[in-house]
Amino acid sequence: MSGRVGDLSPKQAETLAKFRENVQDVLPALPNPDDYFLLRWLRARNFDLQKSEAMLRKYMEFRKTMDIDHILDWQPPEVIQKYMPGGLCGYDRDGCPVWYDIIGPLDPKGLLFSVTKQDLLKTKMRDCERILHECDLQTERLGRKIETIVMIFDCEGLGLKHFWKPLVEVYQEFFGLLEENYPETLKFMLIVKATKLFPVGYNLMKPFLSEDTRRKIVVLGNSWKEGLLKLISPEELPAHFGGTLTDPDGNPKCLTKINYGGEIPKSMYVRDQVKTQYEHSVQISRGSSHQVEYEILFPGCVLRWQFSSDGADIGFGVFLKTKMGERQKAGEMTEVLTSQRYNAHMVPEDGSLTCTEAGVYVLRFDNTYSFVHAKKVSFTVEVLLPDEGMQKYDEELTPI
């Protein structure tokens, strides 16, 4: 049995009754304490009564902490309202609301230099409540329960800038909050125009997604417009995505409903860096260099780094070894990222690189040009792996 209203086994029905009895003290504070709502928490924990109750009570604490009862009255900062991509537009063929996330135009540094992480998370929670409110309105309009949504992730333009660690951590926290506090609300997550980097991004988020959510993620290949039209009627799908829906002025992107973001003007920044904790620290003698090696087993991995120096600038470049088992000088290796000097003592430096071939990559901090000063360098380096399960879509993924 599916565990939904009208499709419960005797055991599931008994568990639902017991669950309602156990949480009767919080029922008045719930947004809608009907069987549909309670069954979401039971399904999320496989009808384990104790785990479902713990999850629901934790959700009540979350509602209080985030002031969810009044979050729709809250207005996000101007930067978010103008430049945070996404929006609610149309319904699928079953009447479920459709939410669009537009990844490419997202300006990671602009956002986090202009607003706080809490502002971003609160905005995402506000979006969740907007969507649930739309589900309630659809239920009234159609005369039948609408409790799930379709999410469309437009990955056109997904690039290395989106793997900036502070942004990734915000999205990881968001997906964690989504799983814990909005269970069983996702019908499908449709990925369109996925680039070659999508499997890497998916692998970063996967630990924060439940097995059930992962099963609902569908990567649409080259025929993504046809795929969307199977689920969404043309008149409910923006023309930009293959349908016939437009704004009143004929705009195919439906800008009155979907925000497409953009680069945030530096005049709106309130800080010039995000505080970073580094994993390693090394003292580099004057006239010397320091090399860090990372073995990349297959193409498509992403090297991501952050570093800062104390007191003065530092050189940095990335190389690929040509001989294994021995330390090579810069001139003996293949230069992958040209070595140059960075003012990392003034502003922390960060970057990333898609590894196009397997081998041992060397991140080289260069102080050979300094005959007077030693340099202390703090750094963090990560290897981001593509998800193996996504490799089957590789032929249809768009090159970045």
Swiss-Prot record:
PROSITE patterns: CRAL_TRIO, GOLD
Modification note: The N-terminus seems to be blocked.
Gene3D superfamilies in the cross-refs: CRAL-TRIO lipid binding domain, GOLD domain
Ranges where the GOLD domain occurs: 275-383
CDD domains in the record: SEC14 (cd00170)
UniProt domain CRAL-TRIO: residue ranges: 76-249
Tissue specificity comment: Detected in a layer of supportive cells in olfactory epithelium, in the apical region of the trachea and in the surface layer of ciliated bronchial epithelium in the lung.
Cellular compartments per GO CC: cytoplasm
InterPro entries, per the entry: CRAL-TRIO_dom, CRAL-TRIO_dom_sf, CRAL/TRIO_N_dom, CRAL/TRIO_N_dom_sf, GOLD_dom, GOLD_dom_sf, SEC14/CRAL-TRIO_domain
Superkingdom to which the source organism belongs: Eukaryota
SUPFAM superfamilies: CRAL/TRIO domain, CRAL/TRIO N-terminal domain, Supernatant protein factor (SPF), C-terminal domain
Keywords from the named record: Lipid-binding, Phosphoprotein, Transport
GO molecular function, one term: lipid binding
Phosphoserine: residues carrying this PTM: S223
Pfam families in the record: CRAL_TRIO, CRAL_TRIO_N
Job of this protein: Probable hydrophobic ligand-binding protein; may play a role in the transport of hydrophobic ligands like tocopherol, squalene and phospholipids.
Name the record gives this protein: SEC14-like protein 3
Organism, scientific name: Rattus norvegicus (Rat)
